[in-house]
């Protein structure tokens, strides 16, 4: 028996819960929100899909009662205000930091053994805050961003190469931000063959550029943050944990010397399993990639400094 709680019944949280229910990732999924009736209504709607989608996951909707989330194996935190058009992730930090601290207090109280996946933005900084505020071991606090960014990268690579998307592999490291992420073309492949064999340099550069503005593009089109892919990426990470898949996933991890960085949560490839982050994978970076990663870390630290300025940590 396994139990997962999703904090925040907005579009991302509800999508994550729905994907987990349909895939029967956990025995029980709890969706909690501060808005009266929102979680209950969405979980009732989801439950009424069960005969159509042939799943038997226990679904529980809760309004601000963390007792019902007790003993969760994994907690996915999506709660926070969404990014609006022309709003940077960094501008979200003041409000979302306060929300995160309140959530973490309740998660640690009722599910002290849980692995926490942070989805709310600015993701790397809020992952860092979750680690510091919770006092939990670093392997149990994971930021989702790299998984989403890598999925977007693979989609654009598939378009650039004309390859079947299921045969494309690609990875994005660095911060989860428009200017801080680093799509690694040098590591991207189609059926194990470098993508440079399938697409021109110009097309690959376009794939990188489109990936880096992927979130902003969607925000401009729909007027708010995306939800389908972020929700699915979160659900995929939960599945990797509960099924002990030992899956390599680019995600925000706390570094202690890896990649030349310390005391920071930032996107790197990691093996994800039942213990959370089971291993940070060291990949060789070119001089240019290493310089970009260092610059990305500097940018994330600049955002982290706001936490100290507002006395969040």
Language model segments and positions:
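C-terminal substrate-binding/catalytic lobe of Rossmann-fold NAD(P)-dependent dehydrogenases
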Residues: 134-140, 149-313
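N-terminal Rossmann-fold NAD(P) dinucleotide-binding loop
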Residues: 13-14
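Extreme N-terminal starter segment of soluble prokaryotic enzymes
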Residues: 1-4
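Glycine-rich Rossmann-fold phosphate-binding loop(s) that bind the pyrophosphate
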Residues: 9-10
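Rossmann-like NAD(P)(H) cofactor-binding subdomain of soluble oxidoreductases
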Residues: 88-154
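Conserved N-terminal Rossmann-fold NAD(P) cofactor-binding segment
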Residues: 34-72, 301-309
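Rossmann-like NAD(P)-binding element
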Residues: 51-114
